[in-house]
Amino acid sequence: MVFSYYKKLSAAQKRIYEQSDAIITVPLPDAGELQLLIPLLSSALTREDREQVEAVCRKLTLGMADRLAVPPLRVKVLAIRPSASWGELHGLYEPAEGRASAVISLWMRTAKHRRVVAFKSFLRTLLHELCHHLDYELYKLPDSFHTEGFYKRESSLFHQLIKEQLPADPNK
């Protein structure tokens, strides 16, 4: 399945889109060690501790970058999401391009109600922005498009980091 904007892409962009769409998982070595950071992130968000949220996000992204052998990147966690008529900005990936490293910016509060973003939404936003980094640095794509494969890669990382506790099976 291709998204509606696909038909507006140039032939070269369509090739990049198709390459991106074909990659659906990101195998994350030793994810178990990174899973230990997830409760810390959840707790820091619950406590509304921006500095701790940023520190845990940095550890998480540096750990993933190291395991995936891509350049490290900086993470900034900011207060209230920017918004306009187009909606709210959840996260932003800025490639290195002249900087020492790429930067992910995340906002931990919604624009309208200024509430702390739900934990899973916040984590997915972090992983979404990291996937842009992986498109450039791991997969060496010249551009990073939102494809079905892109969203599957984001989910792949999410499910490797979040091990949902399933209810106990009464038959076992």
Residue ranges and their predicted role:
Residues M1-E51:
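N-terminal low-structure segments adjacent to metalloprotease catalytic domains
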Residues R47, Y139-L141:
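Short histidine/acidic/glycine/proline-rich micro-motifs that form metal-
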Residues D49-A102, L161-P170:
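Auxiliary, metal-adjacent structural segments of Zn-dependent hydrolase domains
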Residues R50, K120, D143:
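Flexible, glycine- and charge-enriched loops at secondary-structure boundaries
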Residues L62-D66, H132, S156:
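A generic structural signal for well-ordered alpha-helical segments enriched in polar/charged residues
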Residues R81-K120, H133-E137, H146-L157:
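Active-site scaffold of zinc-dependent metalloenzymes
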Residues S121-L130:
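Short alpha-helical catalytic segment bearing the HExxH-like zincin motif
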Residues L141-K172:
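Post-HExxH zinc-binding segment in Zn-dependent metallohydrolases
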